[in-house]
């Protein structure tokens, strides 16, 4: 992908249909799996079941949804006895459903913390399953040669509400060739509990002491500023940015590409200007080859080609599932998802295949599941 450009998933389409007021995704052999912008509510992946197949259920991260949907469809084609229904409801919702024991597995862009693990009521195994980056997307009525440039500090000041108009001197200094409009900045954030938000606010807390002290890091935070709106899921944020002139928001890269959104160049910790791409996210991950459920952040890493808003998605299962048959099926699915074949699918959807060291971490974690 060229810097600043947008691409679609070649030859892959989504078909949507409405059923009793809910938006569901029907998977065909050409389905990619990205929820398009502007869709509100949970997006549920329903793999058409084979005869007598066992349907597993999962819920959580919208960040990982494009990858999960195609990966689970592919798995079901290879294993006719299993289908997977994955509900893209946000990391916070996924953790809630998992701890309520209404799903077989959950997924979040930040591992479960001590309080959440306590609510689970039994030992939990957390497994890194995907690696990706978050693009800063914007909607302006003017073309910006080479794409909008933002320093780390300016991103924080925009979301703090300190920079409130697009022709602010700080933005004009960074983008001297652009005719930035005298237009209010509308910041767009997640309205639901979100691992995508955790990664983004972790980045902001690393680059701005004011953000860290006033707002902090979390799946859900009190967003400062008077001109800010929320969207449910990555697809909701993408939709709000697309329909609001002067808007700026953060979404997982696959959503920005599928929706042909403008993305900003960010100045990283080493002073280099970078777009969110597979290459720049891969470099960020390479600076920390060993991650765990208690040491996982890869935001704002040093390195000329290290994109500063990068992160992993984690799946979680019970260490000793009550239903050993279903537990074995979930373990097998996640083993396949973290393996080479599925990670090639991730790469085709603008994620970054898990580094070998992280694949080994996933393998060791899944070995702890007793089925």
Identify the meaning behind each predicted range.
Residues 38-41, 58:
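Small side chains
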Residues 24-36:
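Bacterial N-terminal signal peptides that target proteins for export
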Residues 19-20, 35, 48:
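Short, flexible coil/linker elements and helix-boundary hinge sites characteristic
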Residues 4-22:
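Short, Lys/Arg-enriched N-terminal segments with co-localized hydrophobic residues
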Residues 40-50:
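C-terminal segment of classical bacterial N-terminal signal peptides
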Residues 51-371:
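Flexible loop/hinge segments at secondary-structure junctions
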């Amino acid at each position: 992908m060229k810097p600043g450009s947008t691409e679609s998933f070649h030859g892959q389409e989504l078909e949507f249909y409405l059923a009793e007021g809910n938006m569901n995704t029907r998977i065909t052999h050409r389905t990619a799996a990205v929820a398009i912008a502007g869709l509100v509510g949970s997006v549920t992946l329903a793999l058409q079941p084979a005869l007598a197949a066992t349907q597993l259920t999962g819920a959580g991260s919208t960040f990982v949804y494009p990858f999960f949907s195609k990966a689970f469809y592919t798995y079901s084609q290879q294993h006719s006895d299993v289908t997977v229904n994955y509900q893209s409801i946000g990391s916070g919702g996924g953790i809630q459903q998992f701890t309520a024991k209404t799903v077989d597995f959950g997924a979040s862009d930040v591992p479960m913390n001590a309080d959440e693990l306590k609510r689970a009521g039994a030992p939990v195994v957390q497994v890194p399953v995907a690696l990706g980056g978050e693009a800063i997307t914007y909607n302006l009525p003017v073309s910006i040669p080479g794409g909008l440039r933002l320093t780390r500090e300016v991103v924080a000041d925009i979301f703090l509400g300190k920079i409130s108009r697009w022709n602010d001197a700080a933005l004009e200094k960074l983008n001297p060739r652009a005719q930035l409009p005298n237009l209010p900045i509308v910041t767009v954030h997640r309205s639901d509990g979100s691992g995508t938000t955790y990664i983004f606010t972790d980045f902001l807390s690393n680059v701005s002491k004011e953000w860290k002290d006033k707002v902090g890091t979390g799946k859900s935070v009190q967003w400062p500023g008077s001109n800010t709106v929320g969207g449910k899921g990555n697809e909701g944020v993408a939709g709000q940015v697309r329909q609001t002139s002067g808007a700026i928001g953060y979404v997982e890269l696959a959503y920005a590409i599928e929706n042909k959104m403008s993305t900003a160049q960010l100045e990283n910790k080493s002073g280099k200007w970078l777009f969110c791409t597979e290459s720049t996210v891969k470099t960020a991950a390479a600076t920390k080859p060993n991650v765990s459920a208690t040491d996982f952040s890869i935001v704002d890493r040093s390195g000329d080609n290290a994109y500063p808003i990068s992160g992993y998605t984690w799946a979680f299962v019970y260490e000793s599932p009550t239903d050993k048959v279903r537990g074995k099926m979930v373990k097998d699915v996640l083993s396949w998802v973290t393996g080479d074949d599925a990670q090639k699918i991730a790469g085709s959807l603008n994620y970054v295949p898990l580094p070998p060291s992280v694949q080994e971490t996933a393998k060791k974690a899944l070995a702890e599941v007793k089925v």
